[in-house]
Amino acid sequence: MDVEHDDSALQDLEADRSATGGSGDAVDRGFRKVMQIIRAATDERDLYKHKSLRFEKLKGKRKHQRSLRINKQWRLVIELRGEAPNKKVGVIAIEDYH
């Protein structure tokens, strides 16, 4: 899927292996792994197939957003933008789940 980063720091974190996100090396590596899966996906159905990502819709004020688990503590918040076949993933933030 095509990706748009809302935060340039996340774009740098994905592209530059020496960049750090401030949440630790394991989170940085996990983020890059999730981004590889997103880029390889043809649509959101492929994301649901990866059970470990726990791809899910958020609720309340954030019902237009989705999340993917980086690890037990951290999640990647995204938005699905546009219509198929030109749907894009907007990468919003890495958040502490708890």
What are these model-derived regions, one by one?
Residues 38, 42:
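Basic, amphipathic alpha-helical segments enriched in Lys/Arg and hydrophobic/aromatic residues
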Residues 3-4, 51, 87:
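Residues that recognize and position ribonucleotide moieties
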Residues 43-66:
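A short, surface-exposed loop/turn module that caps and links secondary-structure elements
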Residues 59, 66-98:
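Enriched for short, Lys/Arg-rich terminal
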Residues 1-36:
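Arg/Lys-rich, positively charged N-terminal/basic patches that mediate binding to nucleic acids
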Residues 1, 8-11, 45, 53-56, ...:
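Flexible, active-site-adjacent loop/turn segments at secondary-structure boundaries
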Residues 26-33, 50-53, 69:
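Generic alpha-helix structural propensity
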